A protein has these predicted regions:
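PLP-dependent amino-acid enzyme catalytic core
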Residues: 1-215
Length: 215
């Protein structure tokens, strides 16, 4: 689903005049959105610099570099906030660069409302009453929930976050091992009116379940 938001954010920035030919796209990422951005950017002729916590997997780093992105690694202890801070620092230094702001960019959420929600509704013949999604930017959960609730107002949507960094639940940010979710801050695309509850998942449970599902 990350390729669709990459395209949406880039084309929105082009239409608004913020992204000009030959520009550099800078974005903090745990890797998922970065893959989509690097792919769309190279097709459209933009340079991509991605800031990422050093604790992300080697596979993610290799995949991003293979897509032509330049990686700038940040201290793992600072989580995604460290990557955000570094991206802003680079933007201020590099002329003609832009941060697409996936955590706050409404084009992220809107794309899921327009496409992901409609695909789920169509493919389930409307037989969906619960949506559960991990929260990184909040775009997937909240955009999809908004679209599905338009079809079924009684649908319930639940956010998943790391138990050791329960920011959405009102707790304190902390280190965790679940890549792609739990940014350690509440992103602008996390819109509480679309969320009916938060599920906290322990590191070991997430890792074990991921391995079981891969078999």
């Amino acid at each position: 689903v990350k390729d669709r938001i990459a395209l949406a954010m880039i084309e929105d920035a082009e239409r608004s005049g913020l992204l000009k030919p030959g520009a550099t796209i800078i974005e903090p990422t745990s890797g998922n959105t970065g893959v989509g951005l690097a792919w769309v950017a190279i097709v459209k002729g933009y340079k991509t610099i991605l800031t990422m916590p050093e604790t992300m997997s080697d596979e993610r780093k290799s995949l991003l570099r293979a897509r032509g992105a330049e990686l700038v690694l940040t201290p793992g202890a600072k989580g995604m906030q460290g990557a955000v801070d570094k991206a802003e620092e680079l933007r201020d230094k590099i002329p003609g660069s832009i941060i697409l702001q996936q955590f706050d960019n409404p084009a992220n959420r809107a794309m899921h409302e327009k496409t992901t929600a409609e695909e789920i509704w169509r493919d389930t013949d409307g037989h969906v009453d619960i949506l559960v999604a991990g929260v990184g930017t909040g775009g997937t959960l909240c955009g999809t929930a908004a679209g599905l609730k338009r079809h079924n107002p009684s649908l319930k949507a639940y956010a998943v976050e790391p138990d050791s960094s329960p920011v959405l639940s009102g707790g304190k940010a902390g280190p965790h091992k679940i890549q792609g979710i739990g940014a350690n801050f509440i992103p602008g695309n996390f819109v509480r009116e679309y969320v009916d509850g938060v599920i906290r998942v322990k590191n070991d449970d997430a890792i074990r379940t991921g391995r079981e599902l891969s078999l």
